[in-house]
Amino acid sequence: MSKRKKYVRPMTATWWQKLDFYKAYMLREATSVFAVWFCIVLLYGVLCFASNPMPGLGILSFIEFLRNPIVVFLNIITLIATLYHTVTYFLMTPKVMNIIVKNERLPHTVVRNALWAVTALVSVIALVLVYI
């Protein structure tokens, strides 16, 4: 009785560099690193507020941290990465979601525009709440 050797397709470490779709996908997934950075910054801010017995000292030390040029640069990169993630997510979502209204599929543009409208509305509400 002979055993057949199972075929295992070779997979190199650079498999994702062959197609532009995979490159964009990997870049989109890499934006999570910057989300982790932003979470660390927020956690540091909470720790600054909580660790100082004087109410004003915590916010001053956190603002001093935020004014560091390296932190400013990383926050700008984080903003760009987040915007890239949002744009690609909003472009991809209507293709994945099948919303049926009166036995017809809703056009991609309607779903995409609704996502952008909700994003704009939440952003405006957040800005109003911050500056009231």
Swiss-Prot record:
Subcellular localization: Cell inner membrane
Which keywords accompany this UniProt record?
A: Cell inner membrane, Cell membrane, Membrane, Transmembrane, Transmembrane helix
Q: Which domain of life is it from?
A: Bacteria
Sorted alphabetically, the Gene Ontology cellular component annotations on this record are: fumarate reductase complex; plasma membrane
Q: Which Pfam families match?
A: Fumarate_red_C
Q: Main location per UniProt?
A: membrane
For this protein, the record's InterPro entries field holds:
Fumarate_red_C, SQR/QFR_C/D
Q: Its topology with respect to the membrane?
A: Multi-pass membrane protein
GO MF annotations in UniProt: succinate dehydrogenase activity
Q: Where are the transmembrane segments?
A: 30-50, 70-90, 110-130
Which SUPFAM superfamilies does the record associate with it? Fumarate reductase respiratory complex transmembrane subunits
Family annotation (HAMAP family): Fumarate_red_C (MF_00708)
Q: Which family does it belong to?
A: Belongs to the FrdC family.
Stated role: Anchors the catalytic components of the fumarate reductase complex to the cell membrane, binds quinones.
Assembly, in brief, is: Part of an enzyme complex containing four subunits: a flavoprotein (FrdA), an iron-sulfur protein (FrdB), and two hydrophobic anchor proteins (FrdC and FrdD).
Q: Can you say what this protein is called?
A: Fumarate reductase subunit C
Gene transcribed to yield this protein: frdC
